Amino acid sequence: MIKHFLLTLTFGFFLNSCAKPAEHQKKVSDPLDHKSISKTQNSDKNDQTPNVTIEGDDLIVVYKNKKTVYKNLIVNEMSVSTELIQNSDSDFSLLYDQNASSTKIKEKYDFIYSDTGIFLVDKEIIKFGQDGLMMTRLYLDNFNLLNKTYEELQSLGAELPDHFEQDGSSLSIYDSKNIPFATKNFRYSAEDLFISYPDVKDGDIKISNVESANNQAFNLEKIGANQQSKILLEQIIRQFPERIVAYLNLADVLWKIQDHDQAKIHYAKYLSLMKSQNKNLSKVPQRVYDRIK
């Protein structure tokens, strides 16, 4: 009897001692879980990736932890719809689809993020109807989206001529001064291009005014639209290989986007052309020599 009582007492003590570490383990895990949640929140708070979303009629942009609301830019009515297109971490687009008349219209606005706001890089307009297809791109300089209205966006390029094509499908490209400087031809029928837009493969750009094209590429770089500037400068060099300043401008853009190896090649080409064409070498920027070392 006594032996049985001692055995029971010993077994109960053993169970009690085993339970206490389990209770202690549970109490320790709570602060660890809380710390993990806090770390995740801090990580989100320090996330510098730009973010753009739609809330009702407004465009919400978060850039470097700063939230900006662009009011009433989202229009979804009987005849107009708005689509937000996330292009990359540096840019996005708004596409307005209008079908109120027999001539269907799409307008695409390409924006970039900047420390001083959201800037409109270019506006593309494509129309399709009984007259055929017309398509234009207008570049903008220093067009900050802050306090702009949908009506102001719509009015951009209103003075440009409408050149409809029945058989072809090409894009007329204008600089920020409304000067046409290039065309872009597509291998689509007019109807297929309109239906597929903006998901169309790049066409061939033909530059007709190299001075305006180069100036526009330089202006794109100034507002931080480096990829757009790069594409245009590459076309200039391909079609006008003796255009000296284009090599310098392209090298500067490549340097900005951290492609230093290609930048050095174009700095060297720029310097070589300056020498071979007997240009004034005193006009060569010091950064050219510094960066090709």
Regions found by a protein language model. Give the residues of each.
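C-terminal motif of bacterial Sec signal peptides marking the signal peptidase cleavage site
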Residues: 16-17
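Canonical tetratricopeptide repeat
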Residues: 215, 249, 283-284, 288-291
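Acidic, small-residue rich beta-repeat scaffolds with periodic aromatic anchors
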Residues: 5, 24, 97-205
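Acidic/hydrophobic-patterned starts of short beta strands in beta-sheet-rich repeat architectures
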Residues: 35-55, 89-98
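Alpha-helical adaptor scaffolds
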Residues: 180-241, 245
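TPR/TPR-like (Sel1-like) alpha-helical repeat modules
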Residues: 255-278
